[in-house]
Amino acid sequence: SAASDVYKRQALNNLDEKKNYILDSLNYAASIQMAVFGSKSQILKHFKEGFILFKPKDIVSGDFYWFGSVEDEKIVVSADCTGHGVPAALMTIMGNDLLNEIVLQDKIIHPDKILEELDRKIINGLSNENGVERQDGMDMSIVTINAKKQRIYFAGAKNPLYIIYKNEIDTIKGSFFPIG
């Protein structure tokens, strides 16, 4: 019937409007997320040869990178938050903020100590008063580079470090435990 067709068209238009609203919100959230991560070009200024490969599967992502420097130490982080979509994207913001606090404010620069402190803060921050166990967390690689001393330090939480040298790839495994 004609009334049924009108109702279906209105319902489809309503769904289309809601879909567009959600997509606009997700795209805006993605631009905020990228602003939080910082400029790739600003990070790459610190390295003669380098690149950042960031190819999220969804509009907003649980993947993130982070960079900070404390005196002669350059700290680089690559992370993957558990989950997908918006919840994982929110975890990236939490991870970014906690790394700023741990490294830039508290001046913790050793990758293993950064992971320990991050783990503690995420567990405390996400603890549920009802005693319900949460499954939120991150897999992460952290490298601290001191070019003057020609030293690189690594720690990983379920993520390895890949070293490419003379067309060879070496893998250094991280721990089996995630953050959180």
Regions found by a protein language model. Give the residues of each.
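… and, occasionally, acidic/histidine-rich disordered N-termini of signaling adaptors
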Residues: 11-180
